[in-house]
């Protein structure tokens, strides 16, 4: 009984988290297809049947087969999405970073349009509805104002966490999908012949039919039915693939029934429509008047839940990108006790501004739909490329070849058909995609170039300075700087190579005497939840080479991990206790800590020129305007010193100067040479 209850609640949570985007597609897909026909007057029965066939088989091929049956198997320890997939295959080919960057940037950019189009489509259903004697919302401006307020409030509450309302998302989305199915069936029973659309024949015929005025470009609107498939894959880590397997048949059935119900309503009423200046939406038009207001209300709630899921998904996506060092460090907050509840202020307000600007710029859902979906086709194409690399080791060559050929072909066709969206506003999401991609490229390749160009002379072996550090630690002539000095740096675990500036900070800048020297390296792994450490004492009791291994979804709060390491080392008698005479904590065994963070600035004394200099400079600019490393490492309440040092890349050789004159020296001691 407990197992069944657990499965039920897991399925309910999945409905509230995973299917918001794809679940609200019935609000605008058929409406967009009507616009492709030139409006209501351009509709024919063959056109409607063909559209339904294309929508059905797009859902089957793209969502069910590609994502539910294939992509969900490509999980990274339970995590899904384009960055988790990249983490699985990044060691196979270096060039795989390119589809990962492009796909991730496009997915983030497309998210700026999704909340605007879903909420606007829902609120437009209120136009003309009278509450009392007066219509509540009568103009598109009023629709936009209501949508603006809803979206703004949604972004405002993110910092407080949404767990307090998140528990209701599952039951509400269950109600939503039941609503879709019921009123789809209500209309379907009047025109059961629309079930002919289950045959792909009618969809293929429509592509070449004179009834289709836009030709292959109709697929740009059809594609809107499956835009939420990528989000379905990305959210796997929140709910587990089993819950998606259990709930997708219900969700898919509800969507198909509603699309076919809209089609049945259109066929039944062909020639009887009264064309007005208002936007015609078959989703609302097919509802009985007695449930119309409820339909608008539940649609608005579903749109808000879809927007919330997208915002949360964006936080998760960025957290993964930061962990994989594809984006600069950003402060990640946890507004609730739930491990999965995160909040990234920079992303929240960037997304808020972009979404509200999209709403103000496009104004109507009709114009948003014309621009919507272009960027997500790029993401799906990039996911296919990464998936094919993953499948190489999992399936035979023939299956992988068929998979790659089929889905690359289909998605390229969808991409080409969506290109018309560029002139209708798709350029907005593409510009945002390019901006995000530029930041990613600068950060990732800037780091790679910096490491490649680093002067070999700037790296020294920590082992070579072991004796010097121990001598400094025991030198009674030098006052104690701190009991435990922690250098946040990078030590090669095989060669012990460390940046010279690290040791320069300890030895040359007024020697820093400490009882224990900690050299801490944070290593990010492809496993999302790796959490372990290794220690190399190098034959001493006071020099600790600490290597932290953290998954790309783990917090990098060094102070918390270090506390555990210290306790473990003292308990195992690896380092000496540091009893404190003056303390508020009786029995305290360790002294005080000070963390040193070294910040690099590009030195003018470098031979790097041209595009390399530009790339490194841009990378440092982004670093200086991203999250403070003190916040990133969770050291806000620790004693931290930030030291600025020059980043020396292939030092410029300065010619030696000729000595001409030294005037009036005093008491010069000359050395004689034999």
Curated annotation (Swiss-Prot):
UniProt subcellular location: Cell membrane
Reaction(s) catalysed by this chain's protein: K(+)(in) + H(+)(in) = K(+)(out) + H(+)(out)
Pfam families noted in UniProt: K_trans, K_trans_C
Record's bilayer topology term: Multi-pass membrane protein
UniProt KW keywords: Cell membrane, Ion transport, Membrane, Potassium, Potassium transport, Symport, Transmembrane, Transmembrane helix, Transport
Principal place of residence: membrane
GO molecular function: potassium ion transmembrane transporter activity; symporter activity
InterPro entries in the record: K+_transporter, K_trans_C, K_trans_N, Kup
A GO CC term attached to the entry: plasma membrane
TM stretches of this protein: 7-27, 52-72, 95-115, 145-165, 169-189, 204-224, 244-264, 291-311, 342-362, 368-388, 397-417, 425-445
PANTHER family in UniProt: K+ POTASSIUM TRANSPORTER, OSMOTIC STRESS POTASSIUM TRANSPORTER
Matches recorded under HAMAP family: Kup (MF_01522)
Its job: Transport of potassium into the cell. Likely operates as a K(+):H(+) symporter.
Family stated for the protein in its record: Belongs to the HAK/KUP transporter (TC 2.A.72) family.
Record-given protein name: Probable potassium transport system protein Kup
Species name: Ligilactobacillus salivarius (strain UCC118)
Record lineage: Bacteria, Bacillati, Bacillota, Bacilli, Lactobacillales
Gene: kup
């Amino acid at each position: 009984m407990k197992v069944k209850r657990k499965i039920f609640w897991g399925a309910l949570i999945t409905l509230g988290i995973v299917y918001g985007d794809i679940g609200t597609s019935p609000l605008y897909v058929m409406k967009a297809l009507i616009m492709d026909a030139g409006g209501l007057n351009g509709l024919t029965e063959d056109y409607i049947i063909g559209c339904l066939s294309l929508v059905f088989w797009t859902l089957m091929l793209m969502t069910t087969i590609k994502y539910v049956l294939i992509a969900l198997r490509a999980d990274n320890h339970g995590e899904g999405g384009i960055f988790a997939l990249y983490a699985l295959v990044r060691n196979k080919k270096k060039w795989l970073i390119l589809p990962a960057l492009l796909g991730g940037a496009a997915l983030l950019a497309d998210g700026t349009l999704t909340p605007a189009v879903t909420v606007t489509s829902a609120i437009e259903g209120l136009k003309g509805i009278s509450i009392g004697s007066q219509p509540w919302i009568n103009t598109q401006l009023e629709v936009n104002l209501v949508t603006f307020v809803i979206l703004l409030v949604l972004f405002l509450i993110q910092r407080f966490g949404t767990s307090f309302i998140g528990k209701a998302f599952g039951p509400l989305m269950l109600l939503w999908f039941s609503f879709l199915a019921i009123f789809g069936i209500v209309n379907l029973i009047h025109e059961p012949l629309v079930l002919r659309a289950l045959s792909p024949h009618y969809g293929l015929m429509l592509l070449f039919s004179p009834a289709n005025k836009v030709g292959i470009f109709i697929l740009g609107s059809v594609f809107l039915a499956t835009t939420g498939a990528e989000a379905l894959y990305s959210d796997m880590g929140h709910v587990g693939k089993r819950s998606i397997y259990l709930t997708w048949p219900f969700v898919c059935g509800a969507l198909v029934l509603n699309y076919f119900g809209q089609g049945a309503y259109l066929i039944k009423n062909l020639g009887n429509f009264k064309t007005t200046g208002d936007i015609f939406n078959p989703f609302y038009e097919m509802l009985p008047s007695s449930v119309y207001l409820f339909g608008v209300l539940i649609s608005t709630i579903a749109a808000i839940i879809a927007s919330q899921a997208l915002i949360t998904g964006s936080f998760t996506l960025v957290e993964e990108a930061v962990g994989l060092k594809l984006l600069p460090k950003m402060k990640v907050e946890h507004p609730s006790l739930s491990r999965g509840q995160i909040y990234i202020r920079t992303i929240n307000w960037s997304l808020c501004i972009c979404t509200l600007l999209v709403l103000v710029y496009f104004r109507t859902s009709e114009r948003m739909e014309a621009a919507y979906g272009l960027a997500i086709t790029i993401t799906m194409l990039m996911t296919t490329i990464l998936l094919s690399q993953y499948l190489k080791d999992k399936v035979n060559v023939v299956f992988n070849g068929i998979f790659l050929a089929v889905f690359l072909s289909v998605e390229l066709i969808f991409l080409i058909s969506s290109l018309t969206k560029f002139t209708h506003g798709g350029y907005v999401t593409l510009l945002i995609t390019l901006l995000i991609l530029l930041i990613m490229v600068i950060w990732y390749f800037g780091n790679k170039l910096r490491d490649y160009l680093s002067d070999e002379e700037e790296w020294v072996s920590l082992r070579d300075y072991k004796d010097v550090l121990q001598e400094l630690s025991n030198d009674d002539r030098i006052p104690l700087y701190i009991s435990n000095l922690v250098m946040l740096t990078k030590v090669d675990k095989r060669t012990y190579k460390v940046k010279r500036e690290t040791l320069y900070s300890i030895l040359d800048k007024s020697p820093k005497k400490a009882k224990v020297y900690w050299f801490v390296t944070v290593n990010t792994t492809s496993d999302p939840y790796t959490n372990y450490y290794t220690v190399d004492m190098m034959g001493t009791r006071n020099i600790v080479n600490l290597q932290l291994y953290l998954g790309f979804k783990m917090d990098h709060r060094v102070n918390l991990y270090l506390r555990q390491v210290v306790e473990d080392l003292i308990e195992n008698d690896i380092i000496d206790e540091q009893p404190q005479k003056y303390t508020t904590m009786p029995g305290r065994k360790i002294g005080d800590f000070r963390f040193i963070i070294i910040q690099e600035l590009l030195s003018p004394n470098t031979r790097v020129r041209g595009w390399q200099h530009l790339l490194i400079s841009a990378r440092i600019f982004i670093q200086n305007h991203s999250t403070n490393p003190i916040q990133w490492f969770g050291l806000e309440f620790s004693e931290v010193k930030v030291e600025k040092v020059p980043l020396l890349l292939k030092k410029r050789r300065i010619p030696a100067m000729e000595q001409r004159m030294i005037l009036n020296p005093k008491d010069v001691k000359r050395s004689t040479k034999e």
